[in-house]
């Protein structure tokens, strides 16, 4: 089954990057995402499945951010998640929409320019809830959790502004839908992760507090998963573009090191 259905070029001024909006098959649905392919002189077969944060229009995939990763030699694919930007279905915040992440990985595997053993997954914020199961269900080269949610019970308690969204997408509050909160929390998958993991988190993050990173690190360590933890001091959920790019270079360097070890 070929997952690619359509590929529409998006305007980008530099010849070094080809940016397109892709329509692809995810189960029975047609969903969308952004693909950035760096020039042949920059790339070496490595790829990143970038799993965005937010919900619907909040936290939508940004071209400039994807170019940062692509400039470091990676073909990047970032699903928008179902129900967004003309994609079919409904975004469930880590429910059936997980298939959009799995199929995004498969789409990269089907790309002849990609080495199937060198596909890395990055989950930012809510993307952490998408990235951990992807690392369990697909042969990822590595997993990066950046400012990522690891505990859905915590997310419900910490973010009163997200209560309504979580009650809708998780079919109720934790006391009613305990099982759903459990199975969607990356913490409960730590023992199933096979790939090396790097965790990057800002100490002053108020959207996803740093305790998510500390608990995730502990669960992975106890489970015997190779894991590194980097805390970014005096920064919040979003940082300056310059600092963001410095950390992006760092995490991509780590990804390349994992490939050498494979």
Model-identified regions with their sequence ranges:
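Alpha/beta-hydrolase fold nucleophile elbow
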Residues: 114-125
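Short substrate-entry loop that stabilizes the transition state in hydrolases
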Residues: 41-45, 50-89, 153
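Alpha/beta-hydrolase active-site loop
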Residues: 92-112
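C-terminal catalytic histidine-bearing segment of alpha/beta-hydrolase fold enzymes
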Residues: 214, 221-262
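Short beta-strand/loop motif that positions the catalytic acidic residue
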Residues: 193, 199-201, 205
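Mobile cap/lid helix-loop segments that gate and shape the active-site cleft of serine hydrolases
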Residues: 153-189, 195
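Active-site nucleophile loop of the alpha/beta-hydrolase fold
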Residues: 144-154
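N-terminal cap/lid segment of alpha/beta-hydrolase-fold proteins
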Residues: 2-41
């Amino acid at each position: 089954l070929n997952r690619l259905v359509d590929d529409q070029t998006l305007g980008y001024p530099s010849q070094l990057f080809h940016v397109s909006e892709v329509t692809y098959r995810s189960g029975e649905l047609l969903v969308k995402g952004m693909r950035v392919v760096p020039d042949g002189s920059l790339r070496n077969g490595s790829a990143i499945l970038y799993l965005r944060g937010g919900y619907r229009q909040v936290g939508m995939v940004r071209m400039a951010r994807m170019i940062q990763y692509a400039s470091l030699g990676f073909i990047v694919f970032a699903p928008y998640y179902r129900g967004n930007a003309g994609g079919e279905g409904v975004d469930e915040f880590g429910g059936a929409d997980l298939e959009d992440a799995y199929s995004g990985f498969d789409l990269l595997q089907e790309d002849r320019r990609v080495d199937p053993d060198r596909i890395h997954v990055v989950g930012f914020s809510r993307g952490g809830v998408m990235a951990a199961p992807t690392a369990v269900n697909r042969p990822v080269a590595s997993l990066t959790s950046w400012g990522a949610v690891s505990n859905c019970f915590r997310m419900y308690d910490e973010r009163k502004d997200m209560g309504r969204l979580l009650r809708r997408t998780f079919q109720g509050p934790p006391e009613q839908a305990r099982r759903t909160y459990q199975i969607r929390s990356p913490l409960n998958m730590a023992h199933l992760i096979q790939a090396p993991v790097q965790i990057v988190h800002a100490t002053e993050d108020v959207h996803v507090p740093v305790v998510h990173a500390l608990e995730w690190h502990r669960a992975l360590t106890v489970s015997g998963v190779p894991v590194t933890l980097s805390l970014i001091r005096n920064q919040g959920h979003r940082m300056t573009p310059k600092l963001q790019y410095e950390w992006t270079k760092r995490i991509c360097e780590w990804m390349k090191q994992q490939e050498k070890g494979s």
